[in-house]
Amino acid sequence: MTEQSSGSATEQATEQETAKQETGRKNEQPEERTVTDGRYLYCLINTTTAESETGSEQESKAGSEQESKAGSEQESEQATVDWSTTGVDDNTVYVIEGESVGAVVHDCERIYDTESPEQVKQWVLRHQHVVDAASDVFGTPLPMRFNTILEGGDTSVTQWLHENHDTVREELTSFAGTWEYRIHLFWEPSTFEAQIEDEDDQLQELQQRQEEAGSGKSFLLKKQYDKRLRERKQNRRAELTTTLQETVRPVVRELLKQGSGSQLAEDTTPTKKEQVTRLAVLADEENETVLGDRLDEIVEQDGVSIKFTGPWPPYTFAPDLG
């Protein structure tokens, strides 16, 4: 894996959940919202791709009868996958299976509400941890939103999987072997300013006129100079963004430009650098190295750096099935 940052993958969800809790603070005594025989959903998975919990591979067998037997043995293993992780609030995580697809869940009795942004962040990070663990066992999952809960126990989840089987299976097949990557593009404006001041004839002319003018006119010329410099910097930022998109587009399936957002402690901007843009891309696992090599070409430019994180489950691109 390339560099991973928990903050970058959960930033949007954390902000959204924190905003929801801020609204709840207006109530003097917020009531805990309970659920009846609830099942908290982390993600949906393809149970036919589960790795054996013993790590052994089944030997290939010829003939339809032997293939059927191998399939039965694999299904038996899927039901006993040993999760080496815990879920939100230290709950035990398990899989509810249904017709080649499944849901990663834990039993719950309440909605996860709190007035503490830090607690929300920890819940969301734990949610992500479970989804990541599922991806190691079952391949690319379909992540569910934080706080997605079904009432009615395992039976209700099994029924939901049955009713939505074709859609879930189709989406899992579509995302199989693909992962989400986050690309943050930074630059040092001071490096560009020093370069452009030596190359831009208009800036040089305005600078010379300032030096020769009186204080009043010099002030106006300074404003013109600053405006010209801002325009050149804005144009350069746009050029870098376009270059980044054109560089990665040939080797990714999907590309989405993301807002600046607030930076978490795990996802901070490098000192003295400004974030130009950030992208989320969906790419085949086999293209990860090629994608990284293409990004290296951009980094070769003066004052430019890139933070490349992943692979993640497709948080940005997965459909809303909750």
Swiss-Prot record:
Q: Where is the composition biased (Polar residues)?
A: 45-57, 73-85
Bias regions of kind Basic and acidic residues — which residues? 17-36, 58-72
Spell out the GO cellular component terms annotated for this protein, sorted alphabetically and separated by semicolons: gas vesicle
**Alphabetical UniProt keywords:** Gas vesicle
What upregulates or represses it?
Transcribed from early-log phase, decreases as cells enter stationary phase, probably as a long gvpF-gvpM RNA. Highly expressed in 25% salt, poorly expressed in 15% salt, no gas vesicles are formed at 15% salt.
> Where in the cell?
Gas vesicle
Q: A Pfam family in this protein?
A: GvpL_GvpF
Output the GO biological process annotations, alphabetical, semicolon-separated: gas vesicle organization
This protein's major location comes to other
Q: Which InterPro entries match?
A: Gas_vesic_GvpL, GvpL/GvpF
Q: Which first-to-last residue range defines the signal peptide?
A: none
Question: Where is the stretch described as Disordered?
Answer: 1-85
Query: Keyword Transit peptide, does the record have it?
Result: no
Q: Which family does it belong to?
A: Belongs to the gas vesicle GvpF/GvpL family.
What functional role does this protein have?
Proteins GvpF to GvpM might be involved in nucleating gas vesicle formation. A minor component of the gas vesicle. Gas vesicles are small, hollow, gas filled protein structures that are found in several microbial planktonic microorganisms. They allow positioning of halobacteria at the optimal depth for growth in the poorly aerated, shallow brine pools of their habitat.
Q: What's in the misc comment field?
A: Encoded in a 14-gene locus called mc-vac.
Which NCBIfam families does this one have?
A: gas_vesic_GvpL (NF045778)
Describe, as the record does, how this protein assembles with itself and its partners: GvpF to GvpM interact with each other in vitro, and may form multi-subunit complex(es). Interacts with GvpC, GvpN and GvpO.
Q: What is this protein called?
A: Gas vesicle protein L
Which source organism?
Haloferax mediterranei (strain ATCC 33500 / DSM 1411 / JCM 8866 / NBRC 14739 / NCIMB 2177 / R-4) (Halobacterium mediterranei)
Q: What are the top taxonomic ranks of the organism?
A: Archaea, Methanobacteriati, Methanobacteriota, Stenosarchaea group, Halobacteria
